Amino acid sequence: MDLNLCLLCGNSIDAEGLYCSNECRIQDKATTELFSDPLKSPSLNETIDYLALNYFDLFSRRSSMCSSSNSSIYSGIYYTELKNYSVEN
């Protein structure tokens, strides 16, 4: 996954709103799923697991550039949850 593509945020607009790269869409889907069920362990989601282990630092610097009109996952809560998970594992 090339998360540098998140820097292209805003170059694609569809009926659902503003999105970044495909990688950001994958992250959006995975984290939205996590937030819809806060008690669900991130380790049960392979995408979250992969992102937490490999890309937390990069996402913490860049994910604020990515947005969706239908999602508010880019929040302090998200960062705290993912950071805690990445530290514990």
UniProtKB/Swiss-Prot annotation:
It comes from the Eukaryota. Keywords: Nucleus. Induction: Up-regulated transiently when the growth phase was changed from the log phase to the stationary phase. GO terms for biological process: phosphate ion homeostasis. Its main location: nucleus. It is found in: Nucleus. It holds the Pfam family Ecl1. InterPro entries: Ecl1/2/3. Transmembrane segments: none annotated. Belongs to the ecl1 family. Involved in chronological cell aging. This is Extender of the chronological lifespan protein ecl3.
